A protein has these predicted regions:
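Extracytoplasmic/secreted cell-surface and envelope-processing proteins
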Residues: 15-19, 58-60, 109-125, 149, ...
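Extracellular/periplasmic catalytic domains that process cell-envelope and extracellular macromolecules
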Residues: 1, 40-43, 91-97, 213-215, ...
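Short pre-active-site segment immediately N-terminal to the catalytic Zn-binding motif
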Residues: 12, 16-25, 117-144
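Solvent-exposed, polar/charged alpha-helical surfaces in well-ordered, non-transmembrane soluble domains
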Residues: 24-32, 147, 253, 257
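Structural recognition of the beta-strand scaffold that forms the well-ordered cores
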Residues: 4-9, 47-50, 99-103, 123-126, ...
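Propeptide-to-catalytic entry region of secreted or membrane-anchored zinc metalloproteases
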Residues: 1-95, 105-108, 277
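Sec-exported extracytoplasmic/periplasmic mature domains
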Residues: 31-39, 145, 150-154
Length: 285
């Protein structure tokens, strides 16, 4: 049956659709999603759909006009409407195991993902024309591949401070692994690429740190989830840090575990190592 990915569009008017722009953007998004491991290896596990969604005007915003977008309500994203629209791909689609990718017809760089505790998720991705790695490719891989399906957390750093005491508004400032929105996702066994534990025996990637094939790369690196201190990641950099086309080892494992779970198959760590060790050699980051 396969795992479903559904592309829908925002800000594509009749001319954009007739000229094939929406189709081209969907095709590029599809190619980018499967251009990075482990999605490249497990591509046959997925079904990919695109559903036309015509807006009254082209684009997301301009200087002199208020754009009439399809999936907006009172100036906010109407996620419920977008998810309902995605079901047009197939009547029996299970949104709790589906990645919905809302393509914003805009060249500016931005993206975010709505993640819900039942597993449903929608990534909003602009058709960014910024330089690598902040291009459309980077957006698709980070938002849709990392957040929406992989259930991974952000590894980039905005604040040079401890996450528990920082006065910023960019996160929920968890006090520990069980608190805040961070703790909620951790309780769902998500965010496996992050940990607040400084003890290497307690982190989700503990089994990789002394593995002969990963010990030269996987370690404890402080700084993630927007903060320099108080949160740890497993590798120096990855797609969840700065959008490069490389997911860290624990991130790849989490993604493959989810693929296998949704497919009704058993995850085998030895099989994972055999298939994905070459990624380490190919990506000398």
């Amino acid at each position: 049956k396969g795992i479903d990915i559904v592309f829908i569009g925002e800000g594509y008017d009749a001319r954009d659709i007739a000229d094939g722009k929406f189709e081209r953007d969907c095709e590029n998004g599809y190619n980018y999603f499967f251009a990075v491991e482990p999605y490249k290896t497990y591509k046959e596990y997925f079904n990919v759909y695109s559903v036309l969604s015509q807006s009254d005007e082209s684009g997301i915003e301009t200087v002199n006009t208020i754009i009439a977008n399809k999936f907006m309500k009172n100036g906010e994203r109407d996620v419920d409407a977008a998810l309902l629209w995605a079901k047009k791909a197939r009547a029996d689609i299970d949104l709790t195991k589906t990645v919905v990718i809302l393509l914003d017809n805009c060249e500016d760089y931005y993206g975010w993902t709505y993640m819900y505790s039942d597993g449903s998720a929608m990534s909003v991705v602009s058709i960014s024309e910024e330089a690598y790695p902040y291009d459309f490719r980077g957006q698709i891989q980070h938002e849709a591949g990392g957040h929406a399906f992989g259930k991974l957390g952000d590894e980039y750093i905005y604040q040079n401070s401890y996450i528990q005491t920082c006065p910023c508004q960019c996160c929920d400032h968890p006090a520990d692994e069980q608190s805040g929105g961070y703790g909620l996702f951790k309780a769902l066994d998500w965010y496996k690429n992050l940990s607040m534990y400084s003890d290497h025996n307690m982190v989700p990637w503990a089994h990789l740190m002394f593995h002969p094939k990963y010990s030269d790369r996987v370690d404890m690196y402080e700084g993630a989830y927007m903060h320099m201190r108080g949160m740890y990641r497993s590798e120096i950099t990855s797609c969840m840090n700065n959008n490069i086309p490389y997911f860290s080892t624990i991130s790849r494992q989490a993604i493959v575990e989810r693929i296998k779970e949704y497919a009704g198959e058993r995850f085998d760590f030895d099989e994972f190592v055999a298939k994905h060790y070459d990624v380490m050699r190919k990506n000398k980051i």
